[in-house]
Amino acid sequence: FDVLIPAFNRAFPQYLVKVVAVGSGEALKLGETGDADVLLVHSPQAEEVFMANGFGADRQPVMYNDFVIVGPESDSAGIRGLTDPGAALARIAGQRALFFTRNDASGTYSKEQALWRQAGLTPTGDWYRSTGQGMGETLTIAAQKGGYTLSDRATFLAKRKALSGLVILVVGAEELRNYYHVITVNQARNPQGARDFLTWITSPIVRHGLIGTFGVEKYGEPLFIPAAG
């Protein structure tokens, strides 16, 4: 948002954009009540329900990054290099290795729960701990306690200098893709502004000129891949 919103304001100076940075579940609730004009979210199943219930006017793909399973460098569960996230979670559960879950309405928590279901597992016990916090805070706790968690790659890369001993262990599976969509809200108070934002953020110049290069200078790789189009 620190890059996108100033660029949007330069293109459309007639709009005042207020960003409310919350998890996808909370963002969709704001859309349901008409307290947001446009949403940028990454919880596809919840988004589809939102659209089916008539809360959204238009939904378009913007970009994706990926989720990664991170954990202590010592990797007591032995998941390093696995290509199947379900097998990795099964090992973590089998070893009762400490795992931190956000346990919130975020797209990341939704993805984590889907991965447990796909693995045929219901995580319970004192090894499976809820933080009730955002991604950055959950990563910090996992690093401090020597535990595992699911993170989006962008947040991990942005925070990794402060996450001593926490490393990426499982990466690359199709199931770990993290898709972002932009949604204009049916009850938008500024419907034209919402439509202009959707058209702008899905344009080739923004996808490839801003989104596709974001993070390269600082991290040596882009944090997001533009959606096709």
Descriptions of predicted regions:
Residues 63-64, 176:
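A short, structural micro-pattern
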Residues 28-43, 47-62:
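Short beta-strand-centered segments that line the small-molecule binding cleft or hinge
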Residues 64-66, 96:
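Residue-level signal for tight coil/turn positions that link beta-strands
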Residues 69:
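Serine endopeptidase catalytic core focused on the charge-relay Asp
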Residues 1-12, 16-17, 25, 29, ...:
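Exported/periplasmic ABC-transporter solute-binding proteins
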